[in-house]
Design a protein with these regions (language model features):
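Beta1/beta-strand and adjacent pyrophosphate-binding region of the FAD-binding site
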Residues: 1-13
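C-terminal auxiliary extensions adjacent to catalytic cores
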Residues: 300-341
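Predominantly flavin-linked oxidoreductase catalytic cores and closely associated redox partners
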Residues: 10, 34, 108-220, 233, ...
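Active-site-proximal substrate-binding core of FAD-dependent oxidoreductases
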Residues: 233, 237, 271-309
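Hydrophobic anchor at the start of a short beta-strand
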Residues: 5, 26-28, 137, 152, ...
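FAD/FMN-dependent oxidoreductases across multiple families
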Residues: 73, 199-278
Length: 341
């Protein structure tokens, strides 16, 4: 008989688990220290990748019983790839390369969509409360430490919808910056993997670069920031507790596309508690290989510098010319192989 399940954290991983468990008759209680799901975000845009599986992720969500129509998303098949020497090329695919969603507490945000799914399924969410981890079966709390930081600015603009991704060691040492514009709202963000002095200046210089190369007509709204913790634990079930999402180190080390891993791990944890699968095995077989590859790729990217970034960008475009699909390069980059195990 289904019993009570306590989940620590009302983010995407915790709420995906809560939805499935509640729908299958479990008495689900989600405990969140913040006052709402998505409260740690400031309305910034993030991407859900679509290249680590041959199955479209939204279709996979539907197969699990999760409804991607509960939140706003914008699909992209093309991106501006900005080389270190300011050349701009365009990886493109016939399908969906990734989707952009908004994080936060507004009704259309993905966090609120997952909250609605969990509540509709019958889960109880306790906001503004603390719960001891040893009293929970699923640990879905966000990052506690910070091994990467991001600085961004949200602004009004009359520019068309676009996503631009930039490899430039001077603006984002060892990492990347990006521009996202959705329906008149833009976000310019620089991500830093190395510890830097006066980190704010990198954002200022990044904004200046994008203003010079894109007609943004930018009207600033606010500046935002975020952090991520990237580590690979020894195990994902400890004393009966399932560690999901960032709490379990299930994150994309290379370019920070962690939402797919978060949602997937929450689903795996729910299925494990229901007796349908073994969480430890599912994570190690399906997610850990991707995460290890992304960690090795991040290690290499952190040491390339602009000459290396230029080589990567050029190879990406040559690969697209050969394969006829820019998404194939990203699939290759994330595939475990003999040289990256």
């Amino acid at each position: 008989m289904p019993g009570r399940v306590d989940i620590l954290g009302a983010g995407l991983s915790g709420l995906s688990a809560a939805t499935i468990l509640a729908r299958n008759g479990y008495d689900v209680h989600v405990h969140e220290v913040r006052q709402d799901s998505g409260a740690r975000f400031d309305g910034d845009f993030q991407g859900i990748e679509n290249w680590t599986s041959d199955v479209d992720f939204f279709e996979e969500m539907r197969q699990w019983g999760l409804d991607p129509d509960e939140f706003k998303s914008d699909a992209f098949s093309i991106v501006d790839l900005i080389h270190p020497d300011d050349e701009i090329t365009n990886p493109i695919t016939d399908g969906v390369a990734f989707r952009v969603v908004e994080r936060g507490t507004d009704e259309h945000c993905i966090d609120q969509g997952f909250k609605k799914m969990a509540l509709d399924a019958g889960a109880t969410i306790h906001y503004g409360t603390r719960k001891e981890p040893n009293e929970c079966q699923i640990i879905a709390a966000g990052p506690k430490d910070s091994s990467a930081v991001a600085f961004g600015e949200i602004f009004h603009t009359d520019h068309e919808n676009i996503v631009a991704f930039q490899l430039n060691d001077k603006l984002a040492p060892g990492a990347y910056s990006y521009l996202i514009i959705i329906d008149g709202i833009g976000l310019i963000c620089t991500c830093l993997w190395r510890q830097q002095k006066k980190s704010g200046r990198y954002l200022n210089e990044t904004i200046a670069w994008y203003e010079e190369h894109y007609e943004l007509n930018r009207k600033p709204i606010k500046r935002v920031g975020g952090k991520g913790d990237f580590s690979i634990p020894d195990r994902y079930i400890h004393d009966g507790r399932h560690y999901v999402g960032e709490a379990g180190g299930l994150q994309d080390f290379m370019w920070g596309f962690g939402m797919r891993y978060a949602i997937t791990s929450g689903v795996y944890a729910a299925h494990s508690i229901m007796g349908q699968s073994n969480y430890e095995k599912k994570v190690r077989n399906h997610l850990v290989p991707l995460i290890k590859v992304s960690a090795i790729n991040r290690f290499l990217m952190n040491r390339l510098g602009d000459r290396g970034f230029k080589m990567v960008a050029n190879y990406w475009m040559r690969h697209q010319a050969r394969k006829g699909d820019g998404l194939e390069f990203m699939k290759w980059v994330y595939q475990p192989g003999i040289f990256r195990r």
